[in-house]
Amino acid sequence: MLKTEHISFQYEDGKQALTDVSIDLEKGNIIGLIGANGSGKSTLFMQLLGINKPSDGTVYFEGKPLAYTKKALFALRKKVSIVFQDPDQQIFYSNVRDDVAFALRNLGVSETEVEARVTKVLDIVGAKDFQHKPVQYLSYGQKKRVAIAGALVLDTDWLLLDEPTAGLDPIGKKIMMEIIERLASQGKKILISSHDIDLIYEICDYVYMLKDGSVLTDGETSNVFLEKSNVEQAGLVQPWLIKLHQQAGYPLFKKEADFFAHTGKVTN
């Protein structure tokens, strides 16, 4: 269990970044965290990783208030991993397998287990075809997959994804969505922070909407986006499938493929 209860956070310069924020990562399998720039999404990620301690309120990990000791934070970060928007921020080795194996080797895991776990996570993210390529020859999307593999190799339970589809072409976005859904089907809990509203709508089963460091609203994804006034208040726009439903009278579809199947059109 990973959640926050009524947390607030103020930076040293006096800026209030979060105010009375409560989120529960058990609310869904793939949870969306949305809001305009400066709404507190990145700061909230840092709270969930124990990097910053709340000024008020509590972060709960595995049913207990998070203790900010070295031992407690080590345990937290073995189970909660982040993948940054820019994969170059967390890829340090020139070889894919060595990079993914880094954390395990640093922990003294046997080489036999290292090889087995690295192979497993590379398969999960579809990176086996380029596992022996030098990192500098990988595409941006391939680097993102390597970064996810590096986060998964510790057998993390919660995965925090910062803008997972940013900078990807349509095929790369499709592959990333498939990876996220595959991880969720395998029992991983995923929190996605993204400005890609259509991605959030299609892939997430629960959404928290932030505005000025507070939770403006939260709930099942379709219900959140159907409330146009809240979406606009947060400085966002509705997903196109929601607009089609409300403005053109189409049935409400959650996935693009379902809409095109309904209209008899074919999409890749």
Swiss-Prot record:
Primary localization: membrane
Subcellular location: Cell membrane
EC number: 7.-.-.-
Enzyme class: translocase
Record-annotated ABC transporter domain positions: 2-237
Classification via Gene3D superfamilies: P-loop containing nucleotide triphosphate hydrolases
PROSITE patterns attached to this UniProt entry: ABC_TRANSPORTER_1, ABC_TRANSPORTER_2
MF terms in GO: ATP binding; ATP hydrolysis activity; ATPase-coupled transmembrane transporter activity
Annotated ATP binding sites: 35-42
Membrane topology, record value: Peripheral membrane protein
GO biological process terms held by the UniProt record: cobalt ion transport
This protein's GO CC annotations: ATP-binding cassette (ABC) transporter complex
InterPro entries assigned: AAA+_ATPase, ABC_transporter-like_ATP-bd, ABC_transporter-like_CS, ABC_transpr_CbiO/EcfA_su, Co_trans_ATP-bd, ECF_ABC_transporter_ATP-bd, P-loop_NTPase
Pfam families from the UniProt entry: ABC_tran
Top-rank lineage group of the source organism: Bacteria
Keywords from the named record: ATP-binding, Cell membrane, Membrane, Nucleotide-binding, Translocase, Transport
Family under the similarity heading: Belongs to the ABC transporter superfamily.
Purpose: Probably part of an ABC transporter complex. Responsible for energy coupling to the transport system.
Name recorded for this polypeptide: Putative ABC transporter ATP-binding protein LMOf2365_1216
Organism: Listeria monocytogenes serotype 4b (strain F2365)
